[in-house]
């Protein structure tokens, strides 16, 4: 009777669903379905205190659509019951749409209710602290765990059978529900529930029957002897039962996800919609491509060596207000180890134990705003490569003979902390301890202004073009013959005290030596030839072979003078009468004939004195540009990349000012260095004490470097660059060539050598 009366007020139950309806003092289980969904719960007698249920597996053979109602009371069967909660016991199908909870129900209370969690421990002891307000009836409250002590051990439950536990409300001793609760914060408010229904029966693979538990914290004397009275039966409210998925979704707010600042940046994650991808450009990509054609090599040392070409980037597309970190690292581009064999790089096999990636090198300006990064180019000029793993920050440890790929990373420090990585294939390089490919060495010299060591030791890798050029100069000098000095074609200045027209000091009677040419700077362009000054000098040499260094009027003759490219800058020629107090010349002529002191290969006549002006200054008017060999610099010795005037020239020779084993007439150091591009000041020459020599005697070279002839002295700059057919040069330091006659450290070399020798002291 009660079952029919109750089910008439319950909404339609779908196939395969089970509802557990809890009343004050009773619990009714309803089931609708096939034979496998039936449950037989026998009713117990009034005198019995046993309560038992059978599992679903023991219900086979029951009639379809059979309904049994089990009503458990303490001493009698209640005539009118009032429902408390409705439970689905997780029998709802997955295709069932999520039901909307009742608008009067508290979602948080309903979600965390013990009836909707499969874990008994979580359901009883991890519920949030809130009022025991029932979501469906304003006068009914659920007893929540824990009540006093949050420790689960205090509320350890013991399995018992069919007992009823309740708590009476002091304000309502009759047990009849009030219209509204007197105080929602009252912890001893009236609460009715059946033993075991605080932890509902949940069908699972590990539990075949529900377990009835008793709260030991409630004293036994508070239990009623005759059950409940004066309770009115009410119908089940019309509400939708939430699905299991909805209940589990409402549990997720209990675990707070980490904030955006605490989350680590994920490289593979997609950036947020408001994030714009940064664009990275390689500024010196053309230079990198030149090196990449020959397989770029980078020197690595224990102390650390900087890269050339450098990594220079330009960023765009960043948020100007956001902050970013910019850093680089390097990864192995190829697992093989390489070696340079037969002029090319050959893989030798895979190497084990090599780290795939290096550490990171953060730019010194990091962190900074996007406006700062986009304002200027980002150059990692302080990055150093090393093979010492004990180095601190500022170094990237790489292995030699392996190919590495540099990468640049842009990390957004705000929002989602998105990390962007960019790489350029032309920046790949091989780490070496010494350069293997000569093409890479040449490119380093041509483009790196700090490649000083290669220019100082240039003779160790002299090129074929330069050797052929030196041989051509030797051949031209051998074909030139000196002519008799006359008043008509003399070119020696008249107002110069120490520079007369003279015979060669090294002239011998056997005619094996030729005259040494005077430098171009010793010629006074403003003075014409004077016969009065030339007569004594020419007469003094009449007793010898008669050869002098005056030019013949024949167009085939060549004046063997050093051109303007040997150290003087453009402008007026220096005054030979200008002296200094120390009695030494002020600089050293240390620039080879094929190089300009201004830092570039000479391709135009602007680097030299014009031929027509040179002829006018000499007073003879018979010279042309094509007749001076050093004015015609072959283009083969010029750098292939010399179209850019800003690039420093390559292969300059650095001539040491003086040796360490003998006195020298030079003072100071060389005016030029390997990377210098500034024009030097004109050198100052000094006079020497006058020495008289008898006519007819050979002129000699004094220990002070003064050529004495015909009551006049000539100061000769001791270090001199050039190749002569019969002159002996010596080398006592790096590229330190000097004129013969001085006892200095070094080896006197034969003049027939086709190229210069380098002596390592």
Curated annotation (Swiss-Prot):
<dbReference type="GO" id="GO:0001708">
    <property type="term" value="P:cell fate specification"/>
</dbReference>
<comment type="function">
    <text>Probable transcriptional regulator involved in developmental processes.</text>
</comment>
<dbReference type="Pfam" id="PF00907">
    <property type="entry name" value="T-box"/>
</dbReference>
<dbReference type="InterPro" id="IPR001699">
    <property type="entry name" value="TF_T-box"/>
</dbReference>
<keyword id="KW-0539">Nucleus</keyword>
<dbReference type="GO" id="GO:0000978">
    <property type="term" value="F:RNA polymerase II cis-regulatory region sequence-specific DNA binding"/>
</dbReference>
<dbReference type="InterPro" id="IPR018186">
    <property type="entry name" value="TF_T-box_CS"/>
</dbReference>
<feature type="compositionally biased region" description="Polar residues">
    <location>
        <begin position="37"/>
        <end position="61"/>
    </location>
</feature>
<dbReference type="GO" id="GO:0000785">
    <property type="term" value="C:chromatin"/>
</dbReference>
<feature type="compositionally biased region" description="Basic and acidic residues">
    <location>
        <begin position="600"/>
        <end position="612"/>
    </location>
</feature>
<feature type="compositionally biased region" description="Polar residues">
    <location>
        <begin position="167"/>
        <end position="179"/>
    </location>
</feature>
<feature type="region of interest" description="Disordered">
    <location>
        <begin position="545"/>
        <end position="612"/>
    </location>
</feature>
<protein>
    <recommendedName>
        <fullName>T-box protein 1</fullName>
    </recommendedName>
</protein>
<keyword id="KW-0805">Transcription regulation</keyword>
<dbReference type="GO" id="GO:0045893">
    <property type="term" value="P:positive regulation of DNA-templated transcription"/>
</dbReference>
<keyword id="KW-0804">Transcription</keyword>
<feature type="region of interest" description="Disordered">
    <location>
        <begin position="637"/>
        <end position="687"/>
    </location>
</feature>
<feature type="region of interest" description="Disordered">
    <location>
        <begin position="496"/>
        <end position="515"/>
    </location>
</feature>
<feature type="region of interest" description="Disordered">
    <location>
        <begin position="1"/>
        <end position="85"/>
    </location>
</feature>
<feature type="region of interest" description="Disordered">
    <location>
        <begin position="167"/>
        <end position="210"/>
    </location>
</feature>
<dbReference type="GO" id="GO:0005634">
    <property type="term" value="C:nucleus"/>
</dbReference>
<feature type="compositionally biased region" description="Low complexity">
    <location>
        <begin position="180"/>
        <end position="191"/>
    </location>
</feature>
<feature type="compositionally biased region" description="Low complexity">
    <location>
        <begin position="656"/>
        <end position="687"/>
    </location>
</feature>
<keyword id="KW-0238">DNA-binding</keyword>
<feature type="compositionally biased region" description="Low complexity">
    <location>
        <begin position="198"/>
        <end position="210"/>
    </location>
</feature>
<feature type="compositionally biased region" description="Polar residues">
    <location>
        <begin position="496"/>
        <end position="510"/>
    </location>
</feature>
<dbReference type="GO" id="GO:0000981">
    <property type="term" value="F:DNA-binding transcription factor activity, RNA polymerase II-specific"/>
</dbReference>
<dbReference type="InterPro" id="IPR046360">
    <property type="entry name" value="T-box_DNA-bd"/>
</dbReference>
<dbReference type="InterPro" id="IPR008967">
    <property type="entry name" value="p53-like_TF_DNA-bd_sf"/>
</dbReference>
<dbReference type="InterPro" id="IPR036960">
    <property type="entry name" value="T-box_sf"/>
</dbReference>
<feature type="compositionally biased region" description="Polar residues">
    <location>
        <begin position="637"/>
        <end position="646"/>
    </location>
</feature>
<feature type="DNA-binding region" description="T-box">
    <location>
        <begin position="287"/>
        <end position="456"/>
    </location>
</feature>
